[in-house]
Curated annotation (Swiss-Prot):
One of its GO terms (cellular component) is cytoplasm. Binds 2 Zn(2+) ions per subunit. This is Allantoinase. Pathway: Nitrogen metabolism; (S)-allantoin degradation; allantoate from (S)-allantoin: step 1/1. Carboxylation allows a single lysine to coordinate two zinc ions. GO terms for biological process: allantoin catabolic process; purine nucleobase catabolic process. It is an enzyme of class 3 (hydrolase). Its cofactor is Zn(2+). It catalyses: (S)-allantoin + H2O = allantoate + H(+). Its EC number is 3.5.2.5. PANTHER family: ALLANTOINASE (PTHR43668:SF4). The lineage of its organism: Bacteria, Pseudomonadati, Pseudomonadota, Gammaproteobacteria, Enterobacterales. Homotetramer. InterPro entries: Allantoinase, Allantoinase_bact, Amidohydro-rel, DHOase/Allantoinase_Hydrolase, Metal-dep_hydrolase_composite, Metal_Hydrolase.
Length: 453
């Protein structure tokens, strides 16, 4: 058989091992894995490189339509491709209108036409005002539903996202359980975090350390415990978003050991930044839950290596620079990070801490694909989409603003020395990013719908 593409001599991350092996691609799918595979229209030599499954980033905010001055499909997905992401799962906020019904998700699809450099799946929102319309989003093909039990949304904008109270969460989770859909939750205690934040502002405590103190670990842990129990009673599969503390992870592990269907994610910034660095970087490193102290970070690394955290995600949530101005308590909370998930974590987890390549592949791609039912994504195996990223190990560079593809070229990682580089990203057999050529093909990304899997 003649193939479209053969990738030779790379160290390939397979599901349970990593070895030097060749990969053949035909029709955008992985057609063969082995040695002496025959002829192909194109042959790539990956000698000295790690060939990983393309990252499945299960937590991104692209903000289009309605807030494309924050980020947009064109810039956001180019940045993703440059960072080794081949599939993103987009959140139902920060765009306007929020993605909470059939009409609003159709606006998303229209806004993305011709702009997707990578493939994308979409989440629907569970908000205070759409519990009777959740079925609309399920019918369209979302792969899950996101909600906040922490305060969110601009109350001055009618169609912005809204948090849910316990009753709304419970009723929504019951309906999602019936639909076979997972509920994804931002877990922080709204009343306590809001009150502590207002108290700090009144007293003039506006440093990074003050912000972290206003959203203490117990507010995350309490919220995780609460939604775990409510989701269990409601009969709904639960995914806990962006866990920032080992104590929070422990709650998920305990529930899992008791038989509950629950998964969790965390983000690179909780592993590579701490509160002192947050103070130095300033508002660009503000997010919620917040970046915590070094002792907390050490605990997170232990949980990651123990296999208690299912996947790593960017929680890419940028905004215009003027929204990051002023003191930390007042600035927008969100980190621009999807372009540097893979290289930063390969450096920090694999090169500096000895994580195995198969574990890295599971955390960055396989587990997220499995959690959200993306059957063609997340692993290098026969019949799967030919989505790959080439990583050059032990190749240091200093990230600059000019390296970034975001609409606003800012990131808390600017100035950081990163000890690995993404050299090529391949989506369904086509190179969508190359370190020398840039972006050699027109955007070819597609939306992935649940009922098409």
């Amino acid at each position: 058989m003649s193939f479209d593409l053969i990738i030779k001599n790379g160290t390939v991350i397979l599901e349970n091992e990593a070895r030097v092996v060749d990969i053949a691609v035909k029709g955008g799918k992985i057609a063969a894995i082995g040695q002496d595979l025959g002829d192909a229209k194109e042959v790539m030599d990956a000698s000295g490189l790690v060939v990983s499954p393309g990252m499945v980033d299960a937590h991104t905010h692209i903000s289009e339509p309605g807030r494309s001055h924050w980020e947009g499909y064109e810039t956001g997905t180019r940045a993703a491709a440059k960072g080794g992401i081949t599939t993103m799962i987009e959140m139902p906020l920060n765009q306007l209108p929020a993605t909470v019904d059939r009409a609003s998700i159709e606006l998303k699809f229209d806004a993305a036409k011709g702009k997707l450099t990578i493939d994308a799946a979409q989440l629907g929102g569970l908000v205070s005002y759409n519990i009777d319309r959740l079925h609309e989003l399920d019918e369209v093909g979302v792969v899950g539903f996101k909600c906040f039990v922490a305060t969110c949304g601009d109350r001055g904008i009618d169609n912005d996202f809204r948090d849910v109270n316990d009753w709304q969460f419970f009723k929504g989770a019951q309906k999602l359980g019936e639909l076979g859909q997972p509920v994804l939750v931002h877990c922080e205690n709204a009343l306590i975090c809001d009150a502590l934040g207002e108290e700090a502002k009144r007293e003039g405590r506006v440093t990074a350390h003050d912000y972290v103190a206003s959203r203490p670990v117990f507010t995350e842990v309490e919220a995780i415990r609460r939604v775990l129990y409510l989701a269990k009673v409601a009969g709904c599969r639960l995914h806990v978003c962006h866990i920032s503390s080992p104590e929070g992870v422990e709650e998920v592990t305990r529930a899992r050991q008791e038989g509950q269907d629950v998964t969790c994610e965390s983000c690179p910034h909780y592993f590579v930044l701490d509160t002192d660095q947050f103070e130095e970087i300033g508002t660009l490193a503000k997010c919620s839950p917040p970046i915590r102290d070094l002792e907390n970070q050490k605990g997170m690394w232990e949980k990651l290596f123990n296999g208690e955290i299912d996947c790593l995600v960017s929680d890419h949530s940028p905004c215009p620079p003027e929204m990051k101005a002023g003191n930390i308590m007042e600035a927008w909370g969100g980190i621009a990070g999807l372009q540097n998930c893979m290289d930063v974590m390969f450096d920090e987890a694999v090169q500096k801490r000895g994580m195995s390549l198969p574990m890295f592949g599971k955390l960055m791609a396989t587990n997220a694909a499995d959690i959200f039912g993306l059957q063609q994504k997340g692993r290098i195996a026969l019949g799967k989409d030919a989505d790959f990223v080439f990583i050059q190990p032990n190749s240091s560079y200093v990230l600059t603003n000019d390296d970034l593809e975001y609409r606003h070229k800012v990131s808390p990682y600017v100035g950081r020395t990163i000890g690995a580089r993404i050299t090529k990203t391949i989506l369904r057999g086509d190179v969508i990013y190359d370190i020398e050529q840039g972006f050699p093909v027109a955007p070819k990304g597609q939306f992935i719908l649940k009922h098409q899997q």
